[in-house]
């Protein structure tokens, strides 16, 4: 609670978390030495997950900066054609986010293609955006994002297993987005 209040007050999140942990340890009756030992132990346990998260961020940057993300999106839209534009946009966003690209970056990457195609076909921008965001959320179920990485660490499960467990829910979400939600708009 102390950490959250300090962060809201614009205190550096790192210092806020450290101070919150120290106060929490002292209130638990650990004393300063035991509190510091527990803090170091906690950091040691979570460090591999943090390194994986940073690596996913580097991959995301490379996909966007090299133009690979846009190439993937254009290829999917070209393959499926204008008739299936909503599916193509949702699938593009899903695949990009499944590779670790954040939803906002995926949408910004795909949006210019969506807008041009949507204007040519006189489609609703809201439906185009909904398809991209829905697809992005489906990709998040599969991606090596911080939630997935930490879940794998905490359950002592291989990251690939946790990611694979999301395939069926992601595909169901994609189908619902494209064939149920978008047409209702």
Where do the model's predicted regions map?
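Transmembrane alpha-helix interface/packing and boundary motifs in multi-pass membrane proteins
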Residues: 3-10, 60, 93-102, 133-139
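Generic alpha-helical transmembrane segments of integral inner-membrane proteins
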Residues: 1-5, 22-26, 54, 91, ...
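Interfacial loop-to-helix junctions that mark the boundaries of transmembrane helices
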Residues: 8, 38-48, 156-168
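Residues that define the loop-to-transmembrane-helix transition and helix capping
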Residues: 14, 83-87, 126-127, 160
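Hydrophobic transmembrane alpha-helices of multi-pass, membrane-embedded glycosylation machinery
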Residues: 18-25, 110-114, 134
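Membrane-embedded alpha-helical segments and adjacent helix-loop junctions characteristic
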Residues: 32-119
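Hydrophobic mid-bilayer segments of alpha-helices in multi-pass membrane transport proteins
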Residues: 1-6, 10-30, 50-58
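Membrane-core helix-loop-helix motifs of multi-pass transport proteins
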Residues: 116-185
């Amino acid at each position: 609670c102390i950490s959250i209040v300090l962060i809201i007050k614009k205190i550096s999140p790192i210092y806020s978390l450290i101070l919150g942990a120290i106060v929490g340890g002292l209130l638990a009756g650990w004393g300063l030495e035991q509190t510091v030992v527990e803090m170091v132990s906690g950091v040691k346990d979570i460090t591999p997950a943090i390194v994986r998260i940073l690596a996913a961020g580097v991959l995301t940057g490379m996909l966007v900066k090299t133009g690979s993300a846009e190439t993937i999106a254009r290829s999917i839209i070209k393959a499926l054609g204008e008739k299936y534009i909503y599916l193509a946009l949702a699938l593009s966003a899903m695949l990009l986010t499944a590779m670790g690209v954040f939803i906002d970056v995926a949408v910004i990457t795909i949006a210019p293609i969506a807008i041009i195609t949507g204007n040519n076909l006189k489609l609703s921008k809201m439906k185009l955006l909904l398809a991209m965001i829905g697809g992005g959320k489906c990709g998040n179920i599969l991606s090596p994002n911080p939630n997935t990485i930490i879940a794998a660490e905490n359950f002592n499960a291989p990251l690939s297993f946790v990611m694979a467990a999301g395939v069926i829910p992601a595909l169901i979400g994609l189908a619902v987005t494209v064939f149920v939600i978008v047409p209702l708009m």
